[in-house]
């Protein structure tokens, strides 16, 4: 039987690898729970959300200098203030819909069938967008027009369906609205900070009864593993997509979703 520590390490790796790639971390965690006996029980369902904080802090660590400069200039620099407003505007749709319909979404959509279909459809869309002859005109994620930030925020709401991918929805929307691949990916990172912190705080409060000091060590393991893994993945990801695009991730989604459907059809 798998030890809790090993389970925490595996889930931390899955979270760190998939959170910022356009492949759906939630979808992969749900499939891992279903097919590999990982994450059963209320605690492990909450654990999957709690270790996202490690991935969030990886983004803060990578972009610390830029984020600190923006924080210091927010009240004196119009450009910095506008970017902060843009991130908040993009975050707002998901916050409202998540608060209003989060329970319904988890009750009816968090199942492996939905995940597999979402992975395949999302992969096909990502592949299509990546092959389009787009003419980008936005090369800096901190200077998008405010309506563009809002549109990306609405697109991110689709990621409440497990398997869609928060970063994938944000990246596709940004590219269709004129961002180049690197800027689209970077804004998905910035938008992840308030979005994932909100999900973390909400889930921590909602499931506080399942959290005890007995779980502190397991959560710490998953947190550290997701943090380290996410740092490695984000740095590699930006360099890769700038040169090669998103085709690899699109096909990964399609393959994982297809294999998942086959396994489900066979009664797994």
Language-model features: locations:
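Multi-pass membrane proteins that catalyze or facilitate reactions on polyprenyl-/lipid-phosphate substrates
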Residues: 1-268
């Amino acid at each position: 039987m798998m030890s809790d520590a090993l389970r925490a390490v595996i889930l931390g790796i899955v979270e760190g690898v998939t959170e910022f790639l356009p492949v759906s971390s939630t979808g992969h965690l749900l499939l891992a729970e279903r097919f590999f006996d990982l994450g059963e029980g209320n605690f492990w369902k909450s654990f999957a959300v709690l270790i996202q904080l490690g991935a969030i802090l990886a983004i803060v660590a990578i972009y610390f200098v830029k984020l600190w400069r923006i924080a210091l200039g927010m009240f004196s620099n119009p450009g910095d203030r506008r970017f902060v407003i843009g991130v908040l505007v993009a975050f707002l749709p998901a916050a409202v819909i998540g608060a209003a319909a989060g329970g319904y979404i988890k009750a009816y959509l968090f199942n492996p069938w939905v995940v597999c279909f979402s992975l395949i459809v999302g992969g096909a869309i990502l592949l299509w967008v990546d092959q389009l002859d787009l003419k980008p005109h936005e090369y800096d994620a901190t200077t998008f027009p405010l309506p563009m930030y809002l549109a990306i925020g609405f697109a991110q709401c689709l990621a409440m369906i497990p398997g869609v991918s928060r970063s994938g929805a944000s990246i596709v929307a940004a590219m269709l609205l004129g961002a180049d691949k690197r800027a689209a990916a970077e804004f998905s990172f910035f938008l992840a900070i308030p979005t994932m912190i909100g999900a973390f705080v909400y889930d921590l409060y909602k499931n506080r009864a399942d959290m005890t000091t007995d779980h502190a060590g397991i959560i710490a393991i998953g947190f550290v593993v997701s943090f380290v893994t996410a740092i490695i993945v984000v740095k590699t990801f930006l360099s890769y997509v700038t040169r090669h695009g998103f085709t690899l991730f699109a096909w990964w989604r399609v393959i994982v979703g297809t294999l998942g459907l086959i396994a489900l059809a066979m009664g797994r």
